[in-house]
Amino acid sequence: MLSNKRISLIKVLPIPSNKKNVFKINCSSNTTIITTSSTTTTSGIKSYSTHNRSNNDTHTSKSNTIDQHQQQQPQQHQNNDNKHLFTPTPFQSLVKNVNKPFRNDKDPDYLPTHHSVLNMSLDQLIEMYKNRKVVDLSHVPTLDPQDVFINSELKLEEIDVFGFDYDYTLANYGDQVQHLIYDLAMSHLVDEQKYPMALKEIKYDPTFAIRGLHFDVNHGLLMKLDYLNNIQAGAIYHGRRPLTKEEVIQIYGSMQLKRLYCDSFLKPMSDIFCLPEACLIANTIQYLTDHNLAFEPRIIHEDVTAAVGKVHLGGGLHNKIISDFPLYLNKHPLLGEFLLKLKSHGKKLFLLTNNSYFYANHGMKYLLNDQLNGKYEDWTDVFDVIITKCDKPSFFGKGRPFRMYHPDSDRYDWNEVNHFEPKKVYVGGSLKQFTNVSKWRGRSVMYFGDHLYSDLVEPSQKEGWKTGVIIKELEVEVGIQNSPKYREQLAELLQLEDVIRKCQFFSGEKKELFLEQLKTERYKKRLALKEPFNANFGSLFRTHTNATIFASSLQRHADIYTSKIENLISYPLTASLIPSRNYLPHEFKLN
């Protein structure tokens, strides 16, 4: 029996079958040698005998075992009886059973303590890399871009109440809205805040930014971070100029930012409405830099944010959209069918939006009224509670008292709201008051929105609501991942990274040259995988290796996510949505 002391690491050295099978096990405080004969019982199980050696014998036994193993190594490759010990399979995993122990120049008896080593020479590794074959991925299924993706198990039959935001949830805007926001905010910046008139000549670039970025108000840098606050190399900009890795390290001292610094100076840009804001900040900084005009980054951020806020609150944006719905709103024929399906199964529906009733009413009539199939006269008949001007995220905190609003007279009641009436409109309110008045509580309520922090975090944490996020970009991202070219490039990158891991176990000039070649190739392949999503910042959901802050927050705060709300229509309302197993780095991945 092995020592009952905790074994911190086990290494097994198989010895050819023409000798006694000897397996050397390195333990944290002693060394155990297991010797086995080739005798097999009638049940087919080999019998083992073991004995312990004291720590005084450890060095001797290590040397003898390694030397004996090296002398017999050529025979092992020729002996079919030992095929079960190791069958080399390129690119499958880093750790293999040991056939040739690692040698350290300073200590020839040194055996690495972190994991087993390779059974091949450097020349064999180089040859294997040169002769690598394109991985056949034709049997690997693609993902449905319009599927519902699950973070946490969700039983739809337990949901009695479904709530919805308006912007980018029920209302799916076209790309022209981003151009409109940028132009209106730029006009405010120049006309009201007296920024240089020449800025108006710089137009919105829809290809520049992605959402989920962060702006450093201390240094004036727009960047993409992973969930560990690592800056993605090549995805950090001063104005429209990307910074090199050396420049980033000169500024921050590292590619990883401290949590305290992030909390103090980084401003998140988490929803689609932030895209024109990010572009406007970058264009403004670039213009001021090019013309040698001194500026404070924090002030630029405050002015641009204020200008974008004025666009949303001033009425100009909404009036423009209402004047041309076909240009700015994308109608989806399944939206009405999905909402009617919920109603037919006895579900309660509510609308919770920051927009005015005037704006939401015009949009909902355009989107829904021709999809009600004669079952309802107006979209307001479909929703049990309608709340506008709720002022999220303040709504989820202290909030304000609810007030009933009368659209016909543009008048607000002064009375306390102690129950919700059908076809009536309410403004203001708070999450606590909403729960008390509606009596809808906890996990029987599910709310859908497009903004993780403004829409979903607090209702989930404070009231236990189930949450769903609508991410418009998801269909494009999944479509790119499904493309044969992307999948082939990803497979090549994973192969390459496996070779890099193996190469690092060797030493010498030849190894260094080969490793440098591999790293250069890795850099090129990473760029090739980044550019299809966005040439500047890459994917919304991941950096080269890790999940982005956006994706990590999505996993923590959303039970499900999808590209549009009506994607749920194909799921029975009795379905249990079960997530895929989330593997940890040390776990075996079974596909």
From Swiss-Prot:
Region (Disordered): 38-88
Residues where substrate binds: T305, A306, A307, V308, G309, K310, V311, H312, L313
One Pfam family recorded for the sequence: 5_nucleotid
InterPro entries listed in its UniProt record: HAD-like_sf, HAD-SF_hydro_IG_5-nucl, HAD_sf
One function term, GO molecular function aspect: 5'-nucleotidase activity
NCBIfam families (UniProt xref): HAD-IG-Ncltidse
Keywords: Hydrolase, Magnesium, Metal-binding
Binding site for Mg(2+): D165, D167, D450
Active-site residues (renumbered): D165 (nucleophile), D167 (proton donor)
Entry's EC annotation: 3.1.3.-
Name this protein carries in UniProt: 5'-nucleotidase domain-containing protein DDB_G0275467
Cofactors that this protein relies on: Mg(2+)
Top-level taxonomic group: Eukaryota
Species for this entry: Dictyostelium discoideum (Social amoeba)
Bias (Low complexity) ranges: 38-50, 68-78
